[in-house]
Amino acid sequence: MMVEDLGVEAKEAAVREVAKLLPLPELLQSISSIKADYIARQQANDAQLSTMVAEQVEQAQAGLESLSSSEKTIYELRDNFISIDKLCQECQTLIDNHDQIKLLSNARNNLNKTLKDVEGMMSISVEAAAARDSLSDDKEIVNTYERLTALDGKRRFALAAAGEEVGRLREYFEDVDRTWETFEKTLWGHVSNYYKLSKESPQTLVRALRVVEMQEILDQQLAEEAAEAEGEGAMASVANPRRPGKKSTTTSASSKGLAQQKLKVQGKGYKDKCYEQIRKAVEDRFNRLLTLVFEDLKAALEEARMIGEELGDIYDYVAPCFPPRYEIFQLMVNLYTERFIQMLRLLSDRANDLTNIEILKVTGWVVEYQENLIALGVDDSLAQVCSESGSMDPLMNAYVERMQATTKKWYMNILEADKVQPPKKTEEGKLYTPAAVDLFRILGEQVQIVRDNSTDVMLYRIALAIIQVMIDFQAAEKKRVDEPASDIGLEPLCAMINNNLRCYDLAMELSNSTLEALPQNYAEQVNFEDTCKGFLEVAKEAVHQTVRVIFEDPGVQELLVKLYQKEWCEGQVTEYLVATFGDYFTDVKMYVEERSFRRFVEACLEETVVVYVDHLLTQKNYIKEETIERMRLDEEVLMDFFREYISASKVESRIRIMSDLRELASAESLDAFTLVYSNILEHQPDCPAEVVEKLVSLREGIPRKDTKEVVQECKEIYENTLVDGNPPKTGFVFPRVKCLTASKGSMWRKLT
């Protein structure tokens, strides 16, 4: 009835729905489209309804299956409970046979264990063969190692449990030992081939190093276990100090066990072996180079260059494959450097057979190697080990000695040529010879060559060699200067003055450029300054020799002989002398630089003063009023002449001694003598009392007693000024006065 009611309700609902859809007559035309839409919806509803019905059917089937399974399980549980009840009843009857059951159980367990051990022993050869087969694949090296390590574990366990059967068990592990040998040969082959593998198959190298690391860890673990076992044994011996029954056998067994433990504690040492393999590989890499050193230097240096460049690849490819704590790049740098030092020592053994060009090629390669290391981040001090190891010393010695010999031969030829060839003139008329410029051009070239092609230590050696060359050159020039001035001549001496001043400037330039190129630690050991000043000393000597040329002039000698004689008193000496000086000064001023000319004038003035003082002390005529007046006029003539060339203060400071001696010669009393002499000692502290004695002896009318008193008083004044028996300083006059030099020794003996 309910179904019929539902049908009626559905029909009425449908009529209402149609009435809503067709409220107007003109909408009857759309009945066909409405009908089509209705059919489509009906089909969709049918499909959805079919799907829902199917799902409900499947769920009902699953529920039936679960119900059936549950029923089956319940039946099984019921059977099990029944079996348990039966077994419990049976066990109640076995309590009386418990001991026999326990023995049977133990026997069964032992049998199972024995079978398992036998199976394990029988599998050793199979596992060893499998490990050996896996060695053919580089990718399996770690797995192979793990298999072999597992076999080693079995061996340790078996040998520990075997007791007296150890000898019989060892043969089962011989195959394992052979496999280990093959494995280690493969492993160390990979390590030795580190350079090639790092580029072509880095993963193979990494796996090999992983094995090394794993073995190191295992060695550490075994060492710790052995240490713990040893500690436990020691504690046991402390806890049981008296065991008289089995002392000897127990002791021997324990000592043997300890020996085996110590052997195990040492481990395989794979890391050390890894380093050793690398060292051997490096040695093999250098074998060809160390042979080429004796056969073909060019090929040897090319080979060395190629080997040195490998360090870049080692930095980029090899080092990343190794654990950082191995510091493999630093190790490689040390190993390579050691071998290169060996190469340099072999080359040094035949240094005399190598040309300078070949030596420079060797040092040039060392520079390249050092720069390569520095570019790779190696510290400068470590990069320079090759050059500072001493291995290059014979090479550098040979180069430096040849350079010094060649340079010396050259400048000696130049100096000999200067003796016969007239000096050249600049546009300003200054005299010179090419020796100075040529010498420093050659020395500068040597420095530049070494800077461009060699090491810091080689440049340091060249700097020292150049200093020695300059010292030798100065010595050769001094030898030339020491020749009689008249033999040398005015113009060559003027050229020598200019040359040495030019040498000083060039030497300072070379010094500055060389010291700038040297590292500070080497620059501090090189003293160019004193050597450079040596050229100024030679120039100074040449200036004095130029003055001697004037004073050795026959015309000048003729005038000087007349000093303090009749012609001198008549004004026929000093006036003519300064006129001659004027002629010479005109030439010298044109020939030399202004600074040298002023020094020349000062030297000439000093020599003039010395000559006048010397002649004053050696002349035999009594000093009269006209003598004193002429001396005063001489001072004026000399003052007027020399201050045309140098400052008046310099002239006055040098002429002053002539004025003081004039006053001393004209003194009338003891106080006057001592006062003037004291004034002289203030600016000429080396003026001996003998000067007073000579001048007093040339005075008329002074009694002998007064003369002795004056001399004695002056000697006491002089002695009081001495410091440690010597004058506080030396002046320019009295050490050069000839008449005093001859009697100086006896005078000093009297004073002391």
UniProtKB/Swiss-Prot annotation:
Origin superkingdom: Eukaryota
Principal location listed in the UniProt entry: cytoplasm
Low complexity composition-biased segments: 247-256
GO CC annotations, alphabetized: cytoskeleton; cytosol; exocyst; extracellular exosome; phragmoplast; plasma membrane
Presence of the UniProt keyword Transport in the record: yes
Keywords on record: Acetylation, Cell membrane, Cell wall, Cytoplasm, Cytoskeleton, Exocytosis, Membrane, Secreted, Transport
InterPro entries: EXOC3/Sec6, EXOC3/Sec6_C
Compartments where found: Cytoplasm, Cytosol; Cell membrane; Cytoplasm, Cytoskeleton, Phragmoplast; Secreted, Cell wall
Entry-annotated residues carrying N-acetylmethionine: 1
Phenotypic consequence of gene deletion: Male gametophytic lethal due to defect in pollen germination and pollen tube growth.
Example GO BP: exocytosis
Keyword DNA damage attached: no
Region of interest called Disordered, as start-end residue ranges on this chain: 229-260
Family according to the record: Belongs to the SEC6 family.
PANTHER family according to UniProt: EXOCYST COMPLEX COMPONENT 3 (PTHR21292:SF1), EXOCYST COMPLEX COMPONENT SEC6-RELATED (PTHR21292)
Function: Component of the exocyst complex involved in the docking of exocytic vesicles with fusion sites on the plasma membrane during regulated or polarized secretion. Involved in polarized cell growth and organ morphogenesis. During cytokinesis, involved in cell plate initiation, cell plate maturation and formation of new primary cell wall.
Subunit details: The exocyst complex is composed of SEC3, SEC5, SEC6, SEC8, SEC10, EXO70A1 and EXO84B. Interacts with EXO84B and KEU (via C-terminus). Binds to EXO70E2. Binds directly to B1L.
Annotated protein name in UniProt: Exocyst complex component SEC6
Provenance organism: Arabidopsis thaliana (Mouse-ear cress)
Lineage of producing organism: Eukaryota, Viridiplantae, Streptophyta, Embryophyta, Tracheophyta
